[in-house]
Amino acid sequence: MLSLALIAIAYWPANAEPLAARQRIAFPDARLDVCGLPWFNEDKPALRRLPLRLKDRFRPAVWDLAQDPSGGRIRFRTDSTTIGLVAENPHFSNMHHMASVGENGFDLYVGREYVGSAWPDASGKMAKEWRVSRERRMRDITLYLPLYKAVTIQELSLDVDAHLEPASPYAIAKPIVYYGSSITQGGCASNPGGSCQAILERKLNADFLNLGFSGNGLGEPALAEAICELDPSCIVLDFWGNPSADQYAAALPVFVDILRRKWPRMPILVTSPFYFPAEQSGGDVARAQSAKRLTTQEFVEKRRKGGDRRIWYVDGLKMLNREQTAGLVDGVHCNSLGFYFNALGLEPFLRKALK
């Protein structure tokens, strides 16, 4: 087992005082890859998940949530021993069931290793410097953006003589697109890098796009049509959480039909509900969860029997079951442990679909 002293050689907290000489890189910059926000080049420097030109196609609630850059990442390679960030989160808030870092803040990773986080002060401003190593060599850096609040980035900074270049490409460069609810959006991971999608990104070395919309993942055709503008490797439909059982049964076939008109062979995974503790007492929650599980399974089976062999049913109970409820923060939304369970359950299906 490594001692804390040995760990500290590689990573230690940022200095209390800013480093004097810095190489400052205004955002955006061609050497900084913006991932998970595929329409960024249309609307830059805005960090949003849907393009401005499609605004009128979406309900206002969906458009407002699209300003939250969940799944967005800034990636680059550098030999700098320190990384600095200046950003602003003007509308930061604190939900009662979600850590402020996950809701409002940033995570910094070197390769696949977590280094630290940044979060806004009382005025919504962030100025953070991380010391990532004593050793001078090129590394891939990933900065995960907030899951639930809009943000602007003013600049990144490096050692004054450091090199900067675009990040190493993902092994799976075409993004996995996830569409769904607040759970899909990342509620309630403690950190931006702790969402299910971010965990799978690191496991699979795969780019991704998060189109989870808190309370508003209703399977609307406008979202399917927006996805059809992209070039994904796989699509994960995870929107069981928001519609009623009847709404879900009506929306799912329409959503998939739109995708299939564009991509007859695109891998599509459809998840069913994971376990809610309220199910054990029966009642409306148990009935709705059971109905959605049955709808999902029967829909996928019917498609496959009809010749669509590139669609798969993902049993949500493989993503979080009754024995894993410590992974829930409020009986519904996942904490970071819950998202780890989700990722473990979804990973084998993704690996199969992406072969």
Where are these regions (language model features)?
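N-terminal secretory targeting modules
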Residues: 1-175, 351-354
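Glycine- and acidic-residue-enriched helix-capping/strand-helix junction motifs
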Residues: 95-98, 186-194, 286-290
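Catalytic nucleophile-elbow at a beta strand-turn-alpha helix junction centered on a G-D-S/GDSL motif
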Residues: 173-197
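Short helix-loop-beta junction
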Residues: 197-210, 301
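Oxyanion-hole/transition-state-stabilizing segment in secreted/luminal serine hydrolases
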Residues: 200, 217-261, 273-280
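A short helix->loop->beta-strand "cap" motif at the edges of active sites that frequently abuts
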Residues: 263-268
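Catalytic His-Asp segment of secreted/periplasmic serine-dependent ester chemistry enzymes
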Residues: 276-355
